């Protein structure tokens, strides 16, 4: 198992369960969640027709050999996004099995802030699941991102110049559209999920309580 919570994607005839697998360099996988289409042919490298898509997470880095996310796949429409939760460095003598603690409690520190997110999409016309875009600049340290299809924006929290920040990314292009520097570790999400209230405020938990951002 990968530890990632399954997500549901799709409408009409193309409906899927989306997960990341347990490979060292994770893949994003789609599984038909209803009856498998009668004319469906197994994708390359797969013997199980239930698998509708299998895409390797590369972050556009040809030298990448390992990457993992501690979050479930973020789904919006036929798009599926994963983030990097691996610290870029581990101090000498620090136990590798505890590396997630660096991201959990020091995720804004430039030495430990993970960077990178990659979006994949299912094309109902060609029935192909493939990479859409990569953003290597933005950090999504440990929080669970949120996509708002109304604003076409993905929101997350991560490290920016050694401080915590709310980040907004265009869901279609992957370009950064918002950076709100919040500052100290009081704003560390500590693996909390982002959500939007009825008035459009973005909110998330921290170790010290809730954060609610103004609208506009």
Predicted regions and their residues:
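Long, internal scaffold/assembly segments composed of regular secondary structure
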Residues: 1-66
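Conserved beta-strand position repeated once per blade in WD40 beta-propeller domains
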Residues: 3-8, 70-72, 143-146, 191-194
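Structural signal for glycine-centered tight turns and loop->strand junctions in beta-sheet-rich domains
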Residues: 4, 12-15, 26, 78-79, ...
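Residue-level signal for well-ordered, solvent-exposed loop/turn and beta-edge residues enriched
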Residues: 7, 126-128, 173-175, 201, ...
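Loop/turn-rich, solvent-exposed surfaces of beta-rich toroidal or solenoidal domains
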Residues: 15-16, 68-180, 184-185
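Structural signature of WD-repeat beta-propellers
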Residues: 23, 161, 205-207
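Hydrophobic/aromatic beta-strand positions that recur at structurally equivalent sites within the blades
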Residues: 30-34, 120-122, 166-169, 211-216
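Blade-level signature of beta-propeller repeat domains, shared across WD40, Kelch, NHL, RCC1
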Residues: 188-216
């Amino acid at each position: 198992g990968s530890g990632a919570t399954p997500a549901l994607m799709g409408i009409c005839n193309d409906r899927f369960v989306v997960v990341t697998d347990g490979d060292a360099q994770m893949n994003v996988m789609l599984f038909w969640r209803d009856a498998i289409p009668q004319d469906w042919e197994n994708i390359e490298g797969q013997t199980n027709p239930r698998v509708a898509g299998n895409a390797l997470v590369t972050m556009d880095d040809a030298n990448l050999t390992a990457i993992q996310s501690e979050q479930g796949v973020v789904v919006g429409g036929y798009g599926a996004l994963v983030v990097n939760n691996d610290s870029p460095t581990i101090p000498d003598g620090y136990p590798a099995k505890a590396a997630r603690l660096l991201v959990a409690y020091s995720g804004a520190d430039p030495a430990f802030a993970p960077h990178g997110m990659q979006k994949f999409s299912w094309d109902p016309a060609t029935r192909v699941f493939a990479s859409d875009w990569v953003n290597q600049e933005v950090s999504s340290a440990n929080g669970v991102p949120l996509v708002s299809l109304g604003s076409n924006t993905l929101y997350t929290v991560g490290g920016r110049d050694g401080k915590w920040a709310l980040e907004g990314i265009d869901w279609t292009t992957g370009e950064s559209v918002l950076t709100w520097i919040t500052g100290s570790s009081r704003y560390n999400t500590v693996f909390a999920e982002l959500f939007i209230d009825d008035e459009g405020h973005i909110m998330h938990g921290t170790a010290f309580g809730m954060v609610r951002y103004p609208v506009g």
